[in-house]
């Protein structure tokens, strides 16, 4: 029998009971389920983002409907209603117009969103985000120069949006702001300010196009990168499969090295001349 084979039979894997290998084995046993759970979590994120992306796609593809078919005073815009294209007929109330601070355009320039009440034929008010304008200066302490909205009776079209909240947006609703400036577009707060029946949520105007391209209309909503979460899930599961494979490879290498070292010692002892 070859010395190496003989040594394997004598329990060369007993080193697995050493402190170092026990710790390594425990770490491997902890890593495997942890990585599997992380993969499952990433897959759930992928499914959630895919579902939200589908809602956006469905909403943008839906036919325009009158705004009062989807919202009313006190109504909370749902995720299925968000981004739906709606139409409304009425007139802009520029006197009660406000600007929303610290908003960026497509080039990440900081400025304002222009929020103009739109009075419907039945007297209710729809909040219309007419788009982005640049800031007059870094302080944003004075009311900026805002392009006038169309006068008289007009029909507007836009994407329905839910009211903004600090919890959902992370934007703090600061107090003591300069006159006619706000931080959040919230229909309940605007209803109190205007003392009017304000439809829940607001719309991001898409038509008519403003004269001179200002305010700058808001672009289509972007979609979340769901594929990235899918890739992360697969990555974590591959890592979890690699752990036991790596453990076996390391253990076999250690056993082989130990067996070869022991065999070398045995051959050396046999080669020594007998004492006279």
Label each PLM-derived region with a short phrase.
Residues 1-73, 79-276:
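Surface-exposed, charge/polar-rich loops and edge strands
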